[in-house]
Amino acid sequence: GTGTEPAFGNTGTATDPGDGIFTNIGLQASPEFPGGIKNFLALVGKNFRLPEIGEKATMKVFVYFVVEKDGTLTNIKVVRDPGYGLGAEAIRVLKSIKTKWKPGIQNDKPVRTAYNLPITVEIKN
């Protein structure tokens, strides 16, 4: 690869999660935003600056990030960008949200967890 693709999969071991990044599948507890993912998406929507494209449109920006052991978000990347600056705006908004997530849990310990999130953007020009 070119080194830009997000790495999926588990690089820790079952007995010592270490700093490997886990996927949501098979985790004891998935990472969670306070109030749930709907709450997180509402916050994203409130802070998202929509482009002026002169027509109504619904687009999806697919983002990838890592929920760290302390609940912060890192490695924020756009996996699929519909254009119009929406990918860059998605990254800006995610970085601006300071509320911490509850981290993923494996073997009763917080672990770094990969998270994929589609953000639907509705432009009502």
Question: At which residue positions do the language-model features occur?
Answer:
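Charge-biased low-complexity segments
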Residues: 1-125
